[in-house]
Amino acid sequence: MRRLALASLMALVVGCGLISSDVAEIKFNLPPRMYSFDSASFGVPAGISGEVPCGAGQIVTDCCNPPPPLPAPDCSANALTCEQNENGMNVCMAQANVSQSQTMNLGQDVQQLSGLTGLVSISIKRISYEVTVNTLDVDVPEVFLYLAPSGVTDPGDPSAKKFGTLPAISAMTTPAGDVVLESNSASVLESFTSNIQSPFTFIAATTLKVSHSPTGRIDMTITGQLAAKP
């Protein structure tokens, strides 16, 4: 009877907020992951050093097959299309799909979690980003973050799940802020971290459309704060 009364008293104390209900939480920093997008790897066809007007009434009507003596760009990797630029002019545009992946294993990478085994509940406090270097001479559109099983590096893989989004980044700027998380980000994270010792992949991806061969690179670091409950 005494034990029952004590248990009831403890439940009442917790319910009244005198003892935090998250006292068993282990808060920890998400191990930082750095992503570097270098213009040298974008695969933009050579020969578009500047904007090339295209379309009806222009010398170039097909961006991949300009008339001689203009040099023919290599469109085998990333085709050129005739599209409007920010000034409303039709110019030859190249689309570059850029992505990088990093492996993460919370059980090994986070010291506070090294002793945990079995099923663990991981919750998100915040996920943030910082651009540490940006010498790119073109704007970077939204960068999408995905979580995927270990070994998966393609954001287009059916097993890769969208997790969050970084806002567009202007050329030559180094912003920082919070990642905009997907509405189901908690369940996405849980699906890859319920077994704390299982590695998974963290992917960053974006699609650039450029009217000239870009130069420079951008380095971004993703970090944040999570919490674990055994």
PLM regions: where:
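Post-signal peptide N-terminal segment of mature Sec-exported envelope proteins
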Residues: 25-44
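Post-signal-peptide N-terminal segment of Sec-exported extracytoplasmic proteins
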Residues: 38-73
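Short beta-strands within extracellular/lumenal beta-sheet-rich domains
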Residues: 91-118
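A short beta-strand element within beta-rich, extracytoplasmic domains
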Residues: 118-136, 220
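Extended, low-complexity, turn-rich repeat/linker tracts enriched in Gly/Pro/Ser/Thr and Asp/Glu
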Residues: 130-142, 210-214
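Short, surface-exposed beta-strand/strand-loop-strand elements in extracellular ectodomains
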Residues: 137-154
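Cysteine-clustered segments with highest specificity for TGF-beta superfamily mature ligands
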Residues: 167-223
